[in-house]
């Protein structure tokens, strides 16, 4: 007997070898997909009737700062320097481990509700984020943020904590948690420190998550300090490779794109955050043309202000059409691939497609909605019309986290109340 059967669904596999099923069934057992077809002879403990719905791989958010849900709407419509130095950094300085847990749990709740089944996170007090992931049932690739700032003592302390975290949590939560090293950015970490991080990552077989050329300020600072841009510096020290996840990548030259493609670097495109902070427009179309694996991320809620990857997909598709003056740029299915297949590749997880033998991370999207009627093209609807709130069921590792809009994995009201209280108390401490 199977654990779960999802039936009567439009099955969007995202598997290029199989295509979609207009009326299909997905069978799940022991956390994996065991059968996909029109019908099954199997019976199951749980049967989900997905009539008028799409079953698809869960979305993958490849760059966020989960605990920053506590800063949602806290400091908007400000110049970047004022936003960071006058508001975000002072607030972060007052965060406690308990705050990070409550903020991360709120992020997990939001992602379960909006169809994200796995995410990559960089922050601090990361044991608390890992505990939140463990409790929520989601899948995540986590790292402790390392900000050395050319201070050797601080760098040694940060790297020690990063290493401890990598080793403590790798493979935890029934394998749902992966760990990475998280040097913040080339303009906040010295060349020597970045080389040390690369060595430690090699030693532990861990990936690396880094911010890269998010702003023009980084580009100018790197050229002034090193006489070269961030990508060329990282290339020169042997830092880049297919285990590197680079967030933002806005201020890339054509030569930078060539290097990223050659080294197999994974990019997280954070389109809404980049627009909100006026960082610029990442050359996504050029990156994809050069074979760079481009995925999607939301960044933290302080600069987005939510974790809805459906919004991210639509915005990415629209921005790059107008930016290239080409309505055919980033068609719907390609954007869906960025949000699923490419994201899973970036995090090195056996997810992102509905395929026999792969981990059962999938969502059911309710298509019987006014804004989704009529439906001529399912991929188009998912990108241009659907919202995170249309997700009715979320399954991760073969466990139902939300069924028919009811969250089963967490006490939803308590999570929201605890986060609201934590945010209010945090602001009180900041203003004291």
Curated annotation (Swiss-Prot):
Task: Cite the annotated pathway.
Answer: Amino-acid biosynthesis; S-adenosyl-L-methionine biosynthesis
Looking up Pfam families in the UniProt record yields:
Amidohydro_1
Give the protein's cofactors: Zn(2+)
Query: Any idea which GO molecular function terms this record carries?
Result: 5'-deoxyadenosine deaminase activity; 5'-methylthioadenosine deaminase activity; adenosine deaminase activity; metal ion binding; S-adenosylhomocysteine deaminase activity
| The EC number(s) this enzyme carries | 3.5.4.41, 3.5.4.31, 3.5.4.4, 3.5.4.28
Q: Which CDD domains match?
A: ATZ_TRZ_like
GO biological process annotation, one example: S-adenosylmethionine biosynthetic process
Q: Which reaction does it catalyse?
A: 5'-deoxyadenosine + H2O + H(+) = 5'-deoxyinosine + NH4(+); S-adenosyl-L-homocysteine + H2O + H(+) = S-inosyl-L-homocysteine + NH4(+); S-methyl-5'-thioadenosine + H2O + H(+) = S-methyl-5'-thioinosine + NH4(+); adenosine + H2O + H(+) = inosine + NH4(+)
Report the superkingdom from the record.
Archaea
Cofactor binding remark: Binds 1 zinc ion per subunit.
Binding-site positions, Zn(2+): 63, 65, 211, 299
- UniProtKB keywords: Hydrolase, Metal-binding, Zinc
Where is substrate bound in this sequence?
92, 184, 214, 299
- Subunit organization: Homotetramer.
Task: Give the protein family.
Answer: Belongs to the metallo-dependent hydrolases superfamily. MTA/SAH deaminase family.
Note in the entry: SAH is a product of SAM methyltransferases and is known to be a feedback inhibitor of these enzymes. As a result of this inhibition, organisms have evolved efficient enzymes to metabolize SAH via different pathways. The pathway found in methanogens differs from the canonical pathway, it uses the deamination of S-adenosyl-L-homocysteine to form S-inosyl-L-homocysteine for the regeneration of SAM from S-adenosyl-L-homocysteine. 5'-deoxyadenosine is a radical SAM enzyme reaction product which strongly inhibits radical SAM enzymes.
PANTHER family per the UniProt record, alphabetical:
AMIDOHYDROLASE-RELATED DOMAIN-CONTAINING PROTEIN (PTHR43794:SF11), AMINOHYDROLASE SSNA-RELATED (PTHR43794)
The record describes the protein's role as: Catalyzes the deamination of three SAM-derived enzymatic products, namely 5'-deoxyadenosine, S-adenosyl-L-homocysteine, and 5'-methylthioadenosine, to produce the inosine analogs. Can also deaminate adenosine. The preferred substrate for this enzyme is 5'-deoxyadenosine, but all these substrates are efficiently deaminated. Likely functions in a S-adenosyl-L-methionine (SAM) recycling pathway from S-adenosyl-L-homocysteine (SAH) produced from SAM-dependent methylation reactions.
Q: What is this protein called?
A: 5'-deoxyadenosine deaminase
- Organism equals Methanosarcina barkeri (strain Fusaro / DSM 804)
């Amino acid at each position: 007997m199977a654990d779960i059967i999802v039936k009567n669904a439009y099955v969007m596999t995202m598997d290029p070898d199989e295509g979609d099923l207009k009326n299909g069934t997905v069978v799940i057992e022991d956390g994996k997909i065991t059968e996909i077809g029109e019908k099954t002879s199997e019976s199951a403990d749980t049967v989900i009737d997905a009539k008028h719905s799409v079953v698809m791989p869960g979305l993958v958010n490849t760059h966020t700062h989960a605990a920053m849900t506590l800063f949602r709407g806290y400091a908007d419509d400000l110049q970047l320097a004022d936003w960071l130095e006058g508001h975000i950094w002072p607030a972060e300085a007052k965060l406690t481990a308990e705050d990070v847990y409550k903020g991360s749990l709120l992020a997990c709740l939001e992602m379960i509700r909006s169809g994200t089944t796995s995410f990559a996170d960089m922050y601090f007090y990361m044991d608390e984020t890992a505990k939140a992931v463990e409790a929520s049932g989601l899948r995540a690739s986590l790292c402790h943020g390392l900000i050395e700032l050319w201070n050797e003592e601080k760098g040694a302390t940060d790297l020690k904590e990063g290493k401890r975290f990598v080793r403590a949590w790798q493979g935890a939560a029934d394998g749902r948690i992966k760990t990475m090293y998280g040097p913040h950015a080339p303009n906040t970490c010295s060349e020597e420190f970045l080389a040390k991080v690369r060595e430690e990552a090699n030693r532990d077989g861990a990936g690396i998550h880094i911010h890269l050329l998010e702003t023009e300020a980084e580009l100018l600072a790197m050229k002034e300090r090193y006489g070269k841009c961030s990508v060329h510096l990282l290339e020169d020290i042997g830092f880049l490779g297919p285990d590197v996840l680079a967030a933002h990548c806005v201020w890339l030259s054509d030569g930078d794109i060539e290097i990223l493609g050659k080294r197999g670097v994974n990019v997280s495109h954070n389109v809404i955050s980049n627009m909100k902070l006026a960082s610029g427009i990442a050359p996504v179309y050029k990156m994809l043309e050069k074979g760079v694996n481009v995925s999607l991320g939301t960044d933290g809620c302080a600069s987005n202000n939510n974790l809805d990857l459906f919004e991210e997909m639509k915005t990415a598709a629209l921005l790059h059409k107008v930016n290239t003056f080409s309505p055919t740029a980033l068609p719907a299915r390609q954007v869906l691939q960025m949000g699923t297949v490419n994201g899973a590749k970036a995090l090195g997880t056996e997810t992102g497609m509905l395929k026999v033998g792969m981990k059962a991370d999938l969502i059911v999207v309710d298509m019987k909605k006014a804004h989704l009627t009529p439906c001529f093209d399912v991929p188009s609807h998912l990108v241009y019309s659907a919202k995170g709130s249309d997700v009715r069921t979320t399954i991760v590792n073969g466990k139902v986290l939300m069924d028919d809009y009811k969250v089963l994995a967490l006490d939803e009201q308590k999570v929201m109340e605890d986060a609201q209280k934590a945010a209010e108390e945090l602001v009180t401490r900041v203003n004291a």
